[in-house]
Amino acid sequence: FLVELFKLEVPEVGQGLIEILGAARDPGLRAKISVKSNDPKLDAIGACVGMRGSRVQSVSNELSGERIDIIMWDEDPAKFVINAMSPAEVLSIVVDEEKKSMDIAVAEEQLSQAIGRGGQNVRLASELTGWDLNVMSKDDADNKIMEENQNLSEVFKEELNVDQDVADVLAREGFSSVDEVAYCSMEEFNSIDDFDEELIQELRKRAIEKIEA
């Protein structure tokens, strides 16, 4: 229904110049829609908002004053989520593709705005993007990363029989399992300044032996 209202109010949507790719609603209270322009010269958000907000206001009035956030769609999931979290500003984001979740860090003073009343903002952003979103303060996010890296370092020390420094570098560079060490390309490994070729070959050898054991 929300999408149909925009088709009526925004000619560019009806003409296919702008696509509405998704919508998430808390009926009567708030909604988020994602838009994409098929014409590089056309500002999708500006067209949907209308002059002085006239178009989006007309849609809002039809829905008992429902507040509508118009979000720019992006093929990069992280960028799309950052857009969807508006009006909160995302400081950092950690993507877990396996769990299809993201940890989102915002400034302490923006935490309540990012989460929204009763979790509304993050819930709608999650529904719109299709990702599980965990919002936290920057300090909490940094502490979580530090704790996870420490845990991974211990795993690498034990599983690969390496010293603390090597284990710390593996964790810091984003390796999350022995499997990833085993099957990482030489090109990716060579981008790590702390490792020379001899160490890389030894790490891969130990990782493969561990997996096949």
Where would I find each of the regions flagged by the language model?
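RNA-contacting regions in translation and RNA-metabolism proteins
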Residues: 1-213
